[in-house]
Each structure stands twice: as structure tokens, then as C-alpha cells.
Amino acid sequence: MMTTLRALVIAFSMYSQIPMPQFTWQDKEMKYAFCFFPWVGAAIGGITMFWWWFCGKFSVGNVAFAMIGTAIPLAVTGGFHVDGFMDTMDAFHSYQPREKKLEILKDSHIGAFSVICLVLYELIYIGAYSEIDAVRQAGIVAAGFFLSRCLSGIAAMTFPGAKKEGLLYMFTSKAHERAVKTALFLQTAAVAVLMLYLDGVTGVAVLVGAGLTFLYYYKTVSYTHLRAHETLSD
């Protein structure tokens, strides 16, 4: 029981800004931490639903609803994933060989492409957020934070890594693969059922979109990894 609780605390300590008890991380606890990665999304979803209720209760306008709603994930995570997104966009749009892209990922400076892609992403996000006008739609958005982390966790445990170092490698290399994958797949199934219950049509659209995106990146990453392996073998 204590190992499970510590694994939960590690997940929140690593992937959120929510204050957590401090202790020395042990391998036996870290190997289950990824099981609780989606729960960070659950926390974001819970705050999102509270914000939806607050806006309805006190007649907050759509602009404030969308802007602050967009800020909630950033505030909870501390922009952890945004930092990675920006690094990735700089590397991807450099159109350089794989080794050069890995160097760009390590560079702490931001480039023009990362800023452009982030602004584009946030504008689309705010625009979509402003169109939420029903509690069930808000519920699906909230559940989406959980779903995205389920799929992200599955990808981290399944896709070949770009490098054998860094925080992601540290967590995935120490993870109990079978237990983590089982937990993530079960949680994915559970949140999928919830989305379909909230709104069948919207739920199907979200799940299909998420599934296709996952498959696209699976094929892309697997192909890139295969080509890199073939190049090293030549």
C-alpha cells in the first residue's frame, strides 16, 4: 500500500506543480509511477469542471472562460509538456539529420518555429474552448486530459526512445512494463466508456481522433527508428 501511495506521489511530483510530500525516490516505487500519470490529467480535469461550474454560477464571459481554461493545464503542470513541445517543434522543423535534431532537443534556447507552433496551438485551443456550451462537452474536455496521459504513457512504454538518457528514459527504464501497460490500457478503456456515456457522438469523434493520432505517431516513430537502425548497420 505504501509503495502504491509513494508511486502516486512521485507521479504528481514529477508531472505537476501540486505540492507533494518529499522523500527519496526508490526504484521499487518509481517502477509503478507511470501507472498514475493519467491521474495528473484527472486533477486538471477536476479543476476544469470546477471552472466550468464557476463561470456558469457567476456569469463569467466566454473569453475569460476560454483564456483561463487554457491556462489551467499550464498552471497545474508548470508548462512541463509545453517545454518539450517547443523543443520538439524546433528539432522537427530544422529538417536536419537525426543526430542534429537530438542536439537541438538538448538546446535550452527557443527558436522561431517553437514560438510559431506554440502560438498556433494555443490559438486553436482557445478557439475550441470558447465553443464549449454544455456540461457534457466540458466533461469530455476534462476527461481528455486523462485520456491524453493514458495514451502518452502507453506511447512512452511502447515506442522506441530517441535516446538512452533523460527523465523519460529514467522512468520508462525503471518501470514494471507489464503492470504499467496493463494499468494504462485499463484506464484508457475506462475513460473511453465515460466519454461515450457523456456524449456518444462527440465521444466517438474524440476517441477516433486520438486513436488515429496515436497510430500515426506509432508508424512514424517506428519507421524513423527502423531507418536509423538500418543506417547504423550499413
Residue ranges and their predicted role:
Residues 2-23:
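Membrane-proximal soluble regions of multi-pass membrane proteins
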Residues 21-23, 154-163, 215-223:
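C-terminal ends of transmembrane helices
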Residues 150-184:
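Solvent-exposed interhelical
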Residues 31-48, 88-136, 140-141, 178-195:
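Multi-pass membrane catalytic core of lipid/isoprenoid biosynthesis enzymes
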Residues 17, 81, 90, 118, ...:
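Alpha-helical transmembrane segments and their lipid-water interface positions
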Residues 224-231:
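Conserved small/polar residues in nucleotide/adenosyl-binding loops
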Residues 183-223:
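Glycine/small-residue-rich hydrophobic helix-like segments
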Residues 36-86, 140-142, 202-218:
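Membrane-embedded alpha-helical segments that form the functional core of polytopic membrane enzymes
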